[in-house]
Amino acid sequence: MAEEEENQELYIAENEVEEVIKDNDKLMDQGVTEDEAEQEQNDTMNNMVMDMSVQGFFEHKDSVFSVSINPVHSNLCASGGGDDLGYIWDITTGEQICQLTGHKDSIVAIDWSFDGTYIATGGMDSQVRLWKSSTGFEFITAFETVDEIVWLSWHPKGLFLAAGCNDGSIWMWSLPSGKVVQVMYGHTAPVNAGKFIPPGVGKRLATVDDSGTLIVWNPATGAPECRMSSDDHRFDPGNEETAAGWTSFDCNAEGNVLFLGGSSGKVKVVNINSSHILASLEAQTESVEAIALCTALPICACASVDGTVALYDSASLKFRKSLPHEQAVIDCKFLPNTPYLLTACADCVIRKWDVRSGQLLGEYTGHQEPILCMAITPDGKRVVTGSDDTELLVFDCEH
């Protein structure tokens, strides 16, 4: 009986048949050819980004504009973004430690005090807010200015905080009292960058603005010690056709020479003790977004929107070489006391370079949108990046 059943033909009724459509037929019905489908698949594969990060933080709901690493407890990272929030989080575990609230607009600046005890946030709502880390990030106070905050800078040896505003004013407070020490006026345009100089000493405060003016202040008195403006055409960051301002700068260890980057691509080198222009460097054609001086070698790196990083000899002021990138370079920083430079690019990639040879040593990927900010741990082993994709990623930059 079993043998008969085996030999019987299998009969399937017509109403039991399901039509099987081949993938190719379906694609044709949808108006997509095999070649187009294959190309779409290849494009998808090409757009997949390898995530090389060792940790990350994903609580922000909008672009991350600023990031800072605690100088004493280097596992602590502070970040601020377009969601009006700041966060304190651990770069080793990715865990949130504290949410910093109270701003009514984007946080565009965030910075730790020199001893790591305070964290300050600056927002487009004209507020500077302050928290104390040693008391569980207890909120201390809020400082009101008259316009959007552009940058923050702590004094490298004391509890003094400076802030630059969109209206051209510069504010300085003493902590922990919160007393306003100085309000400095002299700029007539947004103050794009400012910091205490020289590095690690902070005897003076240098600021640059969107109209092409540099002012070096005495922070104790609030008086300007050096003022250079585009009224002197030799100092003008623009040209006859286009007005321009200063967008970035860095200072030498002695505190007497500044390298200034302009929105037209020009770099000026000035002695602020004598107010003399030492050089005009014009290897780039678009805005210089960041300038970094190497502490291990006489090298100055200038990152530009034109997709290059220009390297100059900071002693002879001669052009050395250009480091090419795929898109605009947003930031550049040297690993501490090394000839190794990290660059953050709008193509979502962090790159590591040896500035002695110009050799590309590594690329670190993981972001899906342009990188807007980065911070390096004090030991130079890791870099934290913030992006338009709302994420913060941690990369091991030793390898």
Curated annotation (Swiss-Prot):
Share an example GO biological-process annotation for this protein.
cytosolic large ribosomal subunit assembly
Which residue ranges contain the repeat WD?
Answer: 59-99, 102-141, 144-185, 187-227, 241-280, 283-322, 324-363, 366-399
Superkingdom, natural source: Eukaryota
Coiled-coil ranges per UniProt: none
Question: Which protein, by its recorded name, is this?
Answer: Uncharacterized WD repeat-containing protein C25H1.08c
Give the matching Pfam families.
WD40
Chief site of localization: cytoplasm
